[in-house]
């Protein structure tokens, strides 16, 4: 099992334009290549490629030009400059004899309705994270786990070591999230469960090993929306074979339709009785085949479904 993450997905594609967030944050191995005709490396790759189709990787911002409402005022000029230089869907239209399968990741910005008027006929599918507007050949895909943010970041290795570790759950619910990343969604959640004997609430930062260990010691985990619609926590929860508890959302109901998830209208509805009555979701999580969350199998299936 090799978990899904944005960098690994980028590496699997025939050509990657890199991502803006990695370059902005100067993370290890970052790069960003322009999605326009001045990118002669890409043009040459197209001309030398003998396959009927190519797989491409890019971040959501540079996939297509539009007005992004969620951009903070101080970031707008930077975001606009990215879209001014790069527009992958427009670039694909310049090569009508080649077909493209596009993947995105490493991005919090959502895919919106404007995309549907931008897709050229030779793009077979767009497989994007945070694709809250989806349908036809636009498919939402998992955010997966966090990439390595510095040379000492060993979280992927820790997660791999924990996937098959058998830890018997001692409690029902685990709560661990930073409120400041989305106060509107997350404020007040911790307080709902602080005095509950059947829940463990982390009120301070713990290391990644302890986080995953505590997650495995519970059957369910609260998974609220964070910086983006999707969150690495959702997928860490599934890799640990624990049940995400999420507010009802048509995006997640579609994206996670193959996995046991407890959807609620409000986190205040989460009670001990509710979790006990949904024990079957935990049992299902122990039996479910997670092959679809292996990066190679995930990638191959999308390509095969697209061609």
Which functions belong to the PLM regions below?
Residues 268-277:
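A cross-kingdom feature marking charged/low-complexity
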Residues 1-235, 239, 243-259, 274, ...:
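Nucleotide-sugar donor-binding catalytic core of glycosyltransferases
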Residues 261-267:
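Conserved acidic donor-binding segment of nucleotide-sugar-dependent glycosyltransferases
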